[in-house]
Amino acid sequence: MASRIKKGDQVIVIAGKDKGKQGEIIRIDGHRVVVSNVNIVKRHTKPNPQRSISGGLIDREAPIHVSNIQVLNPMTGKGDRVGFKILDDGCKLRIFRSTGEVIGA
């Protein structure tokens, strides 16, 4: 089954404390995604000399639920719903519902 969102998509947050922020999908974990520069949290980390990690407070992105994001439509500059279009050769493409444009083309 094809996914409505993919790693590298430009998305906009539509709900939550970071509503309106835009970013790129870094990682997908089931129904949660990590978006660059969105949902920044502080983590207390211990120093680990074997991995050359200095301890202290580190800011990093935390995952948010996929229902709180929409794929950013570059033509309109707004978040848009994602649909699928099946070509004659059986290839499945992701499209924007409002404009019908192919995503990532």
From Swiss-Prot:
The keyword RNA-binding applies. It comes from the Bacteria. InterPro entries: KOW, Rib_uL2_dom2, Ribosomal_uL24, Ribosomal_uL24_CS, Ribosomal_uL24_KOW, Translation_prot_SH3-like_sf. Gene3D superfamilies: 2.30.30.30. Keywords: Ribonucleoprotein, Ribosomal protein, RNA-binding, rRNA-binding. GO terms for molecular function: rRNA binding; structural constituent of ribosome. Transmembrane segments: none annotated. GO terms for biological process: translation. CDD domains: KOW_RPL26. GO terms for cellular component: ribonucleoprotein complex; ribosome. Belongs to the universal ribosomal protein uL24 family. One of two assembly initiator proteins, it binds directly to the 5'-end of the 23S rRNA, where it nucleates assembly of the 50S subunit. One of the proteins that surrounds the polypeptide exit tunnel on the outside of the subunit. Part of the 50S ribosomal subunit. This is Large ribosomal subunit protein uL24. It comes from Xylella fastidiosa (strain 9a5c). The lineage of its organism: Bacteria, Pseudomonadati, Pseudomonadota, Gammaproteobacteria, Lysobacterales.
